Amino acid sequence: ILKNYMIDKLGGLRMGMPSTGSGRRQDYTFAPTSRMRNTYIAAGSDDDAEMIATMGDGLYAAKMGGGSVNPATGEFNFAVSEGYLVKDGKIAHPVRGASLIGRGGEVLMKIDRVGKDCSRAQGICGSLSGSVPTDVGQPHIRISSMTVGGRDA
């Protein structure tokens, strides 16, 4: 459920909405833009092993790598740095070179299971306003369907 937007002062004036204090920049040489700082998905009640066992065939993306997002369209692509092919609800073998591709809003609507665990990670978000530190956190989530790109190993 969308609760709010990240809006800096200038964006708020343009859209007639109040600023949420989301303007960030690397340093004074960059113009500020609306940027994430701490982004989280709350923990759910599903067991991680059960999510895999009931998925049928798919990809278990254990660790994600870098990627990019088009803020105008919500389109994204992210590398899977550690992934496993799942066949009949069982982890079959590791995969390499996989990437997840989609549109943020559409993929969020396809989350069908949310795990009990919750982990955090630090990263860097690069944009026109420079590179700034970020903090993200989420439990394991299962997405009913999405585009997976890559090549045969």
What are these regions (language model features)?
Residues 1-153:
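N-terminal small-residue-enriched
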